[in-house]
Amino acid sequence: MAKLYFYYAAMNAGKSTVLLQSSYNYRERGMQTLLFTPAIDTRFQYGTICSRIGLSEQAYAFNNSDNLYVLTQEFQLQTQKYSCVLIDEAQFLTREQVYQLTEITDQMSIPVLAYGLRTDFRGELFPGSQFLLAWADELIELKTICHCGRKAIMNMRIDENGQAVIEGEQVLIGGNESYVATCRLHYKRGEAGKTFPRNKLFNKDTNTF
């Protein structure tokens, strides 16, 4: 029986990386996958899911008015049966679109894997995450860490000076320059800690073996 899965985490936990790996695992075995990404996410090339470690894959960029159930039916008529549907940045789904994902699972018997944030920078649920938490068959937490080494569960919005921002619109598209994942304690204190440039993370000179 197909299920709806919600993989949730704080920022920079590798959600898109896990999504792309899952899609690759299906395709490696000759199975078709359908990937969706929200058109509102303008961090990368339009209609592309990109991970922080450099993996990328084309996806259908959807808007809030799109019916994901109908789109999946239409796309499947053009290709062989999909073995899995994968959703990136699922926190941006509407209530209706989360219901449509349950229809893909229940009526079309296709597993749906949705990946997204649980809460915004104020510690409040996104609409998409709220209904995924309520309706998904399986909830899986992807873990990342705070600068102190504890598990990070909060998403802190920061300004250009690295200071915590506590007011503003719920949606502000950004990456490491706008958000940092922290534990609850450092979220309360407004302490973002320090992040490192990507080239420092992959510097071969830092490896001693």
Swiss-Prot record:
Zn(2+) binds at C146, C148, C183, H186. Gene3D superfamilies: 3.30.60.20, P-loop containing nucleotide triphosphate hydrolases. GO terms for molecular function: ATP binding; thymidine kinase activity; zinc ion binding. ATP binds at A9, A10, M11, N12, A13, G14, K15, S16, D88, E89, A90, Q91. Signal peptide: none annotated. Its EC number is 2.7.1.21. Belongs to the thymidine kinase family. PANTHER family: THYMIDINE KINASE (PTHR11441), THYMIDINE KINASE, CYTOSOLIC (PTHR11441:SF0). This is Thymidine kinase. It comes from Legionella pneumophila (strain Paris).
